């Protein structure tokens, strides 16, 4: 015992992991030993823990280790615990040691990330360009990244199951929006009609039900902004035309009344405006309809009432015709102004602590009422006009619904609006086109029920089917809860051409993803209405209007989707067969087999759990570079697979592959029916498409005829901010002849569904992808 008491004096310093020396502190060793005993349920007294510590120091001294490293001390603790008959405690100590190492490693990694965020400009930091909709150089953009990266690492360490955490970290799967794991859901299709009825609140006082189209427009922007602050993804208005048509109708009524008051005063010299207002109010209250199309009955009743006031019948009729004509004209003008304001607002207002412009989408095209047509026409004209200096608006993402009988063929009520949509998209890249007649969309459509019309989020997300409640297979008030993507190329590489082995591992990863989605859902389900003051508190999410502030949201969240995605089908097929699906019929057959199998498996999960598991063609932005970077380190350069900076998005034909627009559509169309959580097909066209709208329309028509669910056409949209020229700009501006040495040209390009006005915001992988994009001929 005398020797044991003397040993501590022999060790005075220790070498830490970073190479620095520090004072030797035996109490730290004793504390670690104590925790290891407690972890196994074995308890000893302090004297015994100290005795083990003394044994450790004695062995170090006997081995002539006078200045040990931390690792040497820990090795010796394990050895002494085993010799003293405590194998379980030794195992607990090993786990404790491993956990401490993991925390240290995570801490070091996080600090390195924080250093990049703090001291590097976004052009030198890929992590600050992870999302092109966030300006990583601003104070709020930087703060958002601090919180995001810290949250991700905390969840990896303490919240995720170890198997989910390691699969994500190692690049087998990718848990999207991991920074919001314990907080909220992804996105929602907002029903403006329901939200605006009787008004709503954003937390600082109530907003009345809007009465004019300008108010409808402003409140639509506020709804998008407010809901985005409750969710981590984008926001979409499912019924933009139907919803704002009510505002047009109210505006027409107000305009007609104003013009009647003015004209009766001027022509009939009747100046009692209050009496005219009371007549209108009474007629409307008693059910008389006054609208752009249906006004004859109202005007007859109005005529009778005004005659009672002693006004000449001929003068009344003259005033009515004047008021009708000018009310329609004024309503159209005011609607255009409101749509211009909406476009400007959604490109200038901010959400999420000022770091982002709301990621917004609007769906329209099917409302054939006069008021709905005015909305559709004027939102398209506002988009065509652009921003203040003619710039192409980045938001909202416009989605024009296409359907036979409504707008696809000549003679149909909204055919002129489809033609206008093609014209505007050929200039501004929006709108995109959603095809209601695609079989997997048409199966839900019920005429006269707009809530059954398919609606997409801008990037591609789709919510329609509902195994939780088949009576509510609608778009309104529903959205995605979360999604996780599989690294298909890696499974293809590991299979080494063995298809059976490929599907075996694919099934393992599918089950892993679905299990992770369930874990995340359980966290989300425990949230309360008060955690989502707008989304749930204002009844935006389906059925949430029936809940109180302290109710949990589990039941209503079951209407949402739990989504598995995939990336790199093309590279996966190259790894398995040597060719991708664009260049080989056999590869295409295998590709369809792979994606249909994935859909079959998520459908099984959906039926077993009675939750809406679904499959998405992943819109990878940061992920396209993340997976391939990890795989390149593991497997090196594999031709056509890991020898570039990005994996190809979802089921797309590689961007570098030369093919025609029609052929690309033909190849990708079969995959749309399997990806029920979302999909999109793009083609890249060359030249100024605004000068060849007929060719543009032919491509859109081919998409519809081949069963595409959602599609769009990419083409160059450049602008010189100096002279204002908009079109295709090479090295020099065709408008003024200058180059961009002093002021760069604006080059609008699409990234994972939305537009970006400068390539500076693209991450390295997406920059490489844009460079590789080839044009598709007709």
Name every feature range the model reports, one short phrase each.
Residues 2-117, 768-774:
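Charged, amphipathic alpha-helical regulatory modules used
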Residues 25, 43, 731, 753-754:
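Conformational switch/transducer regions in large eukaryotic molecular machines and scaffolds
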Residues 99-103, 109-558, 579-580, 584-747:
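Conserved catalytic cores of very large enzyme subunits
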Residues 333-337, 344, 575, 763-770:
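Metallocofactor- and cofactor-centric catalytic cores in central/energy metabolism, strongly enriched
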Residues 562-575, 596, 750:
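Contiguous, well-ordered alpha-helical segments that form the cores/surfaces of helical PPI scaffolds
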Residues 734-778:
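Long insertion/accessory domains within large nucleic-acid-processing enzymes
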